[in-house]
Amino acid sequence: MMLIPTHHFRDIERKPEYLQPEKCAPPPFPGPVGTMWFIRDGCGIACAIVTWFLVLYAEFVVLFVMLIPSRDYAYSIINGIVFNLLAFLALASHCRAMLTDPGAVPKGNATKEFIESLQLKPGQVVYKCPKCCSIKPDRAHHCSVCKRCIRKMDHHCPWVNNCVGENNQKYFVLFTMYIALISLHALIMVGFHFLHCFEEDWTKCSSFSPPTTVILLILLCFEALLFLIFTSVMFGTQVHSICTDETGIEQLKKEERRWAKKTKWMNMKAVFGHPFSLGWASPFATPDQGKADPYQYVV
């Protein structure tokens, strides 16, 4: 009877052709600290530009159609501050999600010398990606757009032109949250402005002509409703993924769980940082993810 090995082979293991030094070039020297990460993908760049354009369009309508023409100065100042603060945090989160290395595995380190340096014991295996010639840590997956293996890759999002992974998931969650909040805020203001225009003379409720005002408000309403639904679903999906400590790819592939199960609170702290603070809501605070080894090669 044929015995099934107790360990699971994924892309590689100990196959002679994969361990030849000439098959994998030595890994490149790491760039200087703070080097910006940016994916040169036409679709992703276009989606990122559209995202900024839509936020700036909402900013234009809120300020120049609804708030500045209003005679209620307290209403205009309070809503202007709130909306601009949320928009600023949303765009800052978008930049951090887009320009932060999501957790790329060093490229080209699957050399014979490096594998031998791991000093594998009998029964231990390492996974290799034949596409980028990297030794894959546990829970890493290859992204065909980024052309790299990404640690704890959840998915590749064209709207941030980047993968959502171990190092930038916090910023992606904040981006979806702040976009949902400014969308809700914009919808509420559009509703109040329509009521105000119906009660007052349409020529006095905006500095634009009535037809132009209606078109601008309807477009903003449609945009805000669409983004509110989309980002709310994405936010809920991401929070659920964090709490269960299971990425979107792992859920789709129904991969066998080989990592330790932790509480929901510990999983949240692993993404947003230790300990809990207002920095969780800030795209400028880099999370301290503790002392976990990000390169767990051997399983």
Swiss-Prot record:
Localization: Golgi apparatus membrane
Q: Its Gene Ontology molecular function terms? A: palmitoyltransferase activity; protein homodimerization activity; protein-cysteine S-myristoyltransferase activity; protein-cysteine S-palmitoyltransferase activity; protein-cysteine S-stearoyltransferase activity
Lineage here is: Eukaryota, Metazoa, Chordata, Craniata, Vertebrata
Quote the record's domain comment: The DHHC domain is required for palmitoyltransferase activity.
The entry assigns this protein to a family as follows: Belongs to the DHHC palmitoyltransferase family.
**Phosphotyrosine modified-residue sites:** Y18
Limits of the DHHC domain: 128-254
Please give the residue ranges for the topological domain Cytoplasmic: 1-47, 94-171, 236-299
Name the reaction it catalyses: L-cysteinyl-[protein] + hexadecanoyl-CoA = S-hexadecanoyl-L-cysteinyl-[protein] + CoA; L-cysteinyl-[protein] + tetradecanoyl-CoA = S-tetradecanoyl-L-cysteinyl-[protein] + CoA; L-cysteinyl-[protein] + octadecanoyl-CoA = S-octadecanoyl-L-cysteinyl-[protein] + CoA
Task: Read off the PANTHER family from this record.
Answer: PALMITOYLTRANSFERASE ZDHHC16 (PTHR12246)
Organism name: Rattus norvegicus
Entry membrane topology = Multi-pass membrane protein
Query: Which InterPro entries does the UniProt record give?
Result: Palmitoyltrfase_DHHC, PFA4/ZDH16/20/ERF2-like
The task this protein performs is described as: Golgi-localized palmitoyltransferase that catalyzes the addition of palmitate onto various protein substrates. Has no stringent fatty acid selectivity and in addition to palmitate can also transfer onto target proteins myristate from tetradecanoyl-CoA and stearate from octadecanoyl-CoA. Plays an important role in G protein-coupled receptor signaling pathways involving GNAQ and potentially other heterotrimeric G proteins by regulating their dynamic association with the plasma membrane.
Q: Name one Pfam family in it.
A: DHHC
Q: Which UniProt keywords apply?
A: Acyltransferase, Golgi apparatus, Lipoprotein, Membrane, Palmitate, Phosphoprotein, Transferase, Transmembrane, Transmembrane helix
Reported modifications of this chain: Phosphorylation by FGFR1 and SRC probably regulates the palmitoyltransferase activity. Autopalmitoylated.
Name assigned to this protein: Palmitoyltransferase ZDHHC3
So what EC number does this one have?
2.3.1.225, 2.3.1.-
* Lipid addition sites, S-palmitoyl cysteine: C146
